[in-house]
Amino acid sequence: MSRIGKLPVAVPSGVDVAIDGARVTVKGPKGTLSHTVAAPITVEKGDGVLDVKRPDDERESKALHGLTRTLVNNMVVGVTEGYEKKLEIVGVGYRVLSKGPTQLEFQLGYSHPITFNAPEGITFAVEGPTRLGVQGIDKQLVGEVAANIRKLRKPEPYKGKGVRYAGEHIRRKVGKAGK
């Protein structure tokens, strides 16, 4: 058995799980998420837990077993607690402005400001001119939006200027030697 896949997914009170064939829908206080489970894997509802089962020990089944369990667990955590990814902006004149909960305006050293709109289910929390948070219930979507914001101006290795994840260490390079 997959070490991760065989662990049951705890379903806290206030979270409703519906299994319709291969479709698992999780409804909680923060919203609703659903996922279609890959072919050989099945999800069974128990007493306050969800069990992810696989029919055989094929290589693909083993891989999908742990993956499916993690995706279902991420949905349960998302609808109860939600996810947040924090970003920092480093550089002279680099800053972010909030234009509402789903729109940001960045000044990142280009000749024009960059407007960034959040997809549905994502909100932004601007904690200062150089700090922001991306929040939502879908872990994959939160990470993707944070990566897209970071891509607007990746941290460069000489001065470290750009958008980075909070706590991210940028590998620095030594500049060219002067005369």
Curated annotation (Swiss-Prot):
Keywords from the UniProt entry: Ribonucleoprotein, Ribosomal protein, RNA-binding, rRNA-binding
Listed as disulfide-bonded, the cysteine pairs are: none
This protein's record includes keyword RNA-binding: yes
Single GO MF annotation:
structural constituent of ribosome
Q: List, in alphabetical order, the GO biological process terms annotated in this UniProt record.
A: cytoplasmic translation
Q: Which GO terms describe its cellular component?
A: cytosolic large ribosomal subunit
Q: InterPro entries from the entry?
A: Ribosomal_uL6-like (IPR000702), Ribosomal_uL6-like_a/b-dom_sf (IPR036789), Ribosomal_uL6_a/b-dom (IPR020040), Ribosomal_uL6_bac-type (IPR019906), Ribosomal_uL6_CS (IPR002358)
Q: Identify the Pfam families for this entry.
A: Ribosomal_L6 (PF00347)
Which family does the UniProt entry place this protein in? Belongs to the universal ribosomal protein uL6 family.
Q: What does this protein do?
A: This protein binds to the 23S rRNA, and is important in its secondary structure. It is located near the subunit interface in the base of the L7/L12 stalk, and near the tRNA binding site of the peptidyltransferase center.
Task: Quote the PANTHER family the UniProt record gives.
Answer: 60S/50S RIBOSOMAL PROTEIN L6/L9 (PTHR11655), LARGE RIBOSOMAL SUBUNIT PROTEIN UL6M (PTHR11655:SF14)
Outline the subunit composition: Part of the 50S ribosomal subunit.
Protein's name according to its UniProt entry: Large ribosomal subunit protein uL6
